[in-house]
From Swiss-Prot:
This is Phosphoenolpyruvate carboxylase. HAMAP family: PEPcase_type1. It comes from the Bacteria. Pfam families: PEPcase. One of its GO terms (cellular component) is cytosol.
């Protein structure tokens, strides 16, 4: 029986024979989906969905006539039928997401196995000669661009085999004769950091995520049964039984509410983020290290692997207070305790397993004196354990030792639980671990004894690796706060103390820097223990104090980064240093600190002046000494806190390292996609040059979002497109809440994601193309970016009708009512303008309406104006850029992917139906301007890529987008209908038309929010 969306015959042209497994899985899920709907809603609903879907082509893009027909169908629905249809389409998208994820994981496993066999013969040092076509270069670049290295496209070489794996990367480096000493130097300093954030919080409820995991587990069981059946094993009834379980699970899912019942608290978001560590990453990261070590040994057996924490994790969840009043100092403290609770529970579980495993008897194995001595010390400190277990384990020293270890861990956990609750621990005198280092030392003692007596234990080795990576803290917490919060706090403090003749905020930048520099070197405290200030100022002060408390309790490693959002000038950084000094996080007398101040440059103007800001900072003796580790030493020496941190390379501030964060979201909202990407690219190059000039190592922190409009997209390609000198083995990237499920829900997908990021960092650092340094190319990009920005701002900021257009034709107001994040959608001003609107709901709204405007608008006009100068030559030049220049290819590829998801006919339907009658004519003009830019951009991108259709170069992605587009269209019609009725109801002007009968605002809002959920699932991102 054909499915509602596609029968196999209908989708045969979408999926080639090599993807029969995926087609088979899609068929199973579609049949299950249809069965659920038939049982839960009846055959009439199934028929309705088929009718709605049949109005659109498999590629989407509903015509005007089709839109009219769909609306007529929807007009006949009551509210319950409309909601059921919306839920059905949303369920379909989430099931398809599961299938595609599982298929991708399966493909990665297969490809990794194939690559290991494929690259085995490549372990020699065969030379690769350049395949450049010098004649073509000379023809195209008669403007001084035809240098010898232009043809050596090292970044693209080997891409067919690379696929982002270690197994292919190291043979590639060998073939290209990269000096092993360079590889070793890079590996030794390799530092890849992924930072989890909570906004936009994943729109899918945790409860629904649990249902999805059950479906994934059952599908994997079905794989095993089907594979056994192919080999002639198993039982005929097994597959049928699993399908019945799948049907039951999906029916339970159908009867579960998709919408969040309440706005999540910050600790809810913490729990959500930590889920991925609990389920996947805690066990997965050690496997990443083993994979790296094995692949390196296959090609460069004499090189040393990186430190085990070469790939580490940070978090903003519970510590990012920029615009989120719910993140308080108390919440940040609880977050650290919560993280420790989770990691301690995992260690306790592992130690219990080791007790069962290490049943080695002294009758049959030697025991070294150091283990026996430690047991004597344990007996004196934990006599209750000895009394309870000494008889049982009298000949089993490893079990007895681990029993002592277990008790110390449990005492540590109990103390941490009291701290989490805000209580005074009652077991302070009990033996416990004050740091992960103490726990690690005991594990290594056991490991040493096993090794010396000819034994090994993989479970123990794995636990040691986990402790080395995660310590007792799991992740590092970054503090983030907006720059004006610090200046406003100082303004109030100084006004209270009457230290300045005028308000601090009235000082010029030069006056601020002069006063701050002097005050930083003053030993007297500025802020007393009592805080007679406003709540906002007290919150800023308490934040620094809680960082100090965190470092004392959990070690410096727990929280040593303070990010200043909307950083614009030197005083923004010095203000944070002064407040850190007041909390004893920085000692200006010796220029030593335990906190790293990280400026975040976000707008285009701030990106452009970032180099000047950093130069001024590096010129300040106090700041330069802080980076070096103090006036008298190049090594950071800090007073040991009560809890000694784990001695890893990142335990203290790394000497001569400056971290700078670059924001993709606000720069894009400010100037458009092309201009934003180019300004960030330029900023990286200029920041690297200034850092080299002052002998400072630079780590760029990329504030990427999940969507293309906020810097999202494939991380591997994005890293390869960065200026090579800006990476040097170090990178830090945000992982937004909305993408965590797609990247980290399944172990093999998580490993592959981390592996591709790491290989890209290594490749970009060692195989630099030099294309970013070709000045004529840069001049062309400068022109394109400027033209794109002008056209973008002409619409967004200068078109007088645009703000009203945005608020009427998109569901921005309804999105703000989704209970998906603890963070408000708007900045505190509360104005309905673009400056107060955050980048996330801005992008979310355009995604819902199928415009996806922030990710492409302005690109077409910029290209067209460039082509108009010399059409043939400039088209040839752009095609050459696309083939040779990783940065340009990344930009065009992202635009192409976004354009493939745009449906301008559907977007026009939003404009026609949601515009107020008196505004329709002026809004139609705005829409016409947007539509013209879309078609222009699409046509020129196709010319540059030399594709007949969008995404012809990536057929797998093309098929996925087509499959989704066709079903998002009817869901969009339902959304428009519900939004129109809802807004009429709000205006007390309800009339018949869109959905018959009268319904409460609550019912209509619920229906609209369900469609938002569904479209987000179909588009696979929110903002």
């Amino acid at each position: 029986m054909g499915s509602v969306l596609y029968s196999l015959s209908e989708s045969a042209n979408l999926y080639p024979a090599s993807e029969l497994f995926l087609r088979h899985r899609l068929q199973i899920v579609e049949e299950l989906w249809e069965s659920v709907l038939r049982q839960e809603c009846g055959q009439n609903m199934v028929d309705l969905l088929r009718q709605l879907r049949d109005l659109c082509s498999p590629e989407g893009q509903a015509t005007k006539d089709q839109a009219v027909s769909a609306v007529k169908l929807i007009e006949q629905l009551n509210i319950n039928e409309a909601i059921r249809a919306a839920r059905a389409f949303a369920l379909y998208f989430q099931l398809i997401n599961i299938i595609e994820q599982e298929y991708e994981q399966r493909q990665q496993l297969t490809r990794y196995s194939d690559l290991e066999a494929e690259t085995a013969p490549l372990n020699g040092s065969e030379n690769i000669t350049s395949s450049s076509n010098h004649n073509e270069d000379d023809v195209i670049f008669n403007r001084g661009l035809g240098t010898d290295f232009l043809g050596k496209n090292w970044t693209n070489r080997g891409q067919g085999k690379q696929k982002g794996t270690f197994a292919a990367l190291f043979p590639l480096l060998s073939k290209l004769n990269v000096p092993p000493q360079q590889i070793q130097r890079l590996i030794s300093q390799l530092d890849v950091r992924l930072v989890f954030t909570a906004h936009p919080t994943e729109i899918v409820r945790h409860t629904i995520r649990d249902k999805q995991r059950q479906v994934v587990d059952l599908l994997q069981q079905l794989d095993e049964v089907e594979n056994r059946a192919k080999e002639g094993g198993g039982y005929p009834w097994e597959a049928g039984e699993i399908r019945e379980k799948l049907l039951e699970e999906i029916r339970l899912w159908w009867r579960t509410d998709e919408l969040h019942q309440f706005k999540p608290t910050v600790l809810d978001e913490v729990d959500y983020a930590l889920h991925y560590f609990q389920e996947v990453l805690f066990d997965g990261i050690p496997q990443l290290y083993k994979r790296f070590k094995y692949a390196l040994n296959q090609t460069f057996s004499w090189l040393e692997p990186p430190s085990k924490d070469f790939c580490s994790f940070g978090s903003w969840v519970g510590s990012d207070r920029d615009g989120n009043p719910s993140v308080t100092p108390e919440i940040t403290w609880q977050t650290a305790c919560y993280q420790r609770k989770m990691v301690l529970e995992r260690y306790i579980k592992s130690v219990k397993q080791l007790i069962e495993l290490l049943s080695i008897s002294m009758h049959w194995s030697d025991v070294l004196p150091d283990l026996l001595e430690s047991l004597e010390l344990d007996q004196s400190q934990l006599s209750e354990v000895y009394d309870a277990l000494a008889l049982r384990y009298r000949q089993e020293p490893y079990r007895l030792k681990l029993a002592y270890v277990l008790k110390r861990l449990e005492n540590t956990r109990d103390r941490n639980l009291a701290l989490y609750k805000g209580e005074t621990p009652t077991n302070e005198d009990s033996p416990m671990y004050r740091s992960g280092a103490e726990f690690l030392a005991e594990l290594r003692l056991i490991q040493h004894n096993l090794t010396e007596t000819g034994l090994s234990c993989r479970e123990l080795d794995n636990l040691i690796c986990q402790v080395e990576i995660f310590d007792f803290n799991l992740t590092k917490l970054d503090i983030r706060q907006e720059s004006t919060r610090h200046s406003d706090a100082l303004n109030e403090i100084l006004d209270y103390l009457q230290l300045l003749p005028q308000p601090y905020n009235d000082l010029s930048e030069e006056q601020r820097v002069a006063w701050l520099t002097t005050e930083l070197q003053t030993r007297r405290p500025l802020i007393s223990s009592e805080l007679p200030f406003s709540d906002k100022t007290n919150d800023v002060i308490k934040t620094f104090r809680v960082v100090r408390s965190l470092q004392q309790e959990f070690g410096i490693n727990i929280c040593q980064t303070y990010i200043i959002s909307m950083c614009r000038q030197v005083s923004d950084v010095l203000e944070v240093l002064l407040l850190a000094k007041e909390a004893r996080l920085f000692d200006p007398a010796i220029a030593v600190g335990t906190i790293q101040v990280v400026p975040l440059f976000e707008t285009v103007e701030d990106l452009q002046r970032s180099r000047s800001v950093m130069r001024q900072l590096f010129e300040l003796p106090l700041y330069r000494a802080l980076l070096a580790g103090g006036y008298k030493s190049t090594e950071v020496k800090v007073p040991s806190p009560e809890s000694t941190p784990l001695p890893t390379p990142h335990s203290v501030l790394t000497p001569d390292l400056q971290e700078v964060m670059l924001g993709y979201s606000d720069s894009n909202k400010d100037s458009g996609f092309l201009s934003s990407n180019w300004e960030i690219h330029k900023a990286q190059k200029s920041l690297q040059k200034i850092a080299e000039e002052y002998g400072v190592n630079l780590r760029i922190f990329h504030g990427r979002g999940g969507s293309v409009g906020r810097g999202g997209g494939p991380a591997h390609e994005a890293i390869l497109a960065q200026p090579g000198h800006s990476i040097n083995g170090r990178i830090k990237i945000t992982e937004q809440g909305e993408v965590l499920a797609s990247k980290y829900s399944l172990l093999d997908l998580a490993l592959y994601n981390l592996e591709t990021i790491t290989t890209a960092v290594i490749q970009a650092s060692l195989l630099r193309t030099g294309f970013d340094d070709i000045e004529p190319w840069n001049e062309i990009m400068e022109e394109l970016a400027a033209r794109s920005r002008q056209h973008y701002r002409g619409l967004i900021y200068e078109q007088p009708d645009f703000i009203d257009f945005f608020h009427q034709v998109t569901p921005i107001e309804e999105i703000s009512q989704l209970q998906i994040s603890s963070r408000p959608a708007r900045r505190p001003s509360g104005k309905k303008d673009l400056s107060s609107l955050r980048a996330i709901p801005w992008v979310f709204s355009w995604t819902q309406t199928r415009f996806l405007l922030p990710s492409w608008y302005g690109v077409g006009t910029a290209l067209q104006e460039f082509f108009n100068e010399e059409p043939e030559e400039h088209l040839k030049l752009m095609r050459y850029f696309y083939v040779k220049w990783p940065f340009f290819k990344m930009v065009i590829s992202k635009v192409e992917m976004t354009l493939a998801k745009v449906d301008m006919q559907m977007a026009g339907h939003y404009v026609q139906e949601l515009s107020d009658p008196e505004d329709k004519s002026r809004f139609e003009k705005v829409f016409e301007q947007i539509a013209n830019e879309y078609y222009l951009t699409r046509d020129l991108v196709l010319k540059i890529t030399d594709h007949s259709r969008l995404l012809d170069g990536d057929p797998v992605l093309q098929r996925s987008v087509q499959l989704r587009n066709g079903t998002i269209v009817p869901l969009g019609f339902i959304q428009v209908s519900l939004l129109k009725r809802l807004r009429q109801s709000k205006n007390n002007n309800a009339t018949s038309g869109v959905i018959h009968s009268r319904y409460s605002k609550g019912e209509l809002l619920r229906g609209a929010l369900l469609t938002i959920n569904g479209i987000a699932a179909g588009m696979r991102n929110t903002g």
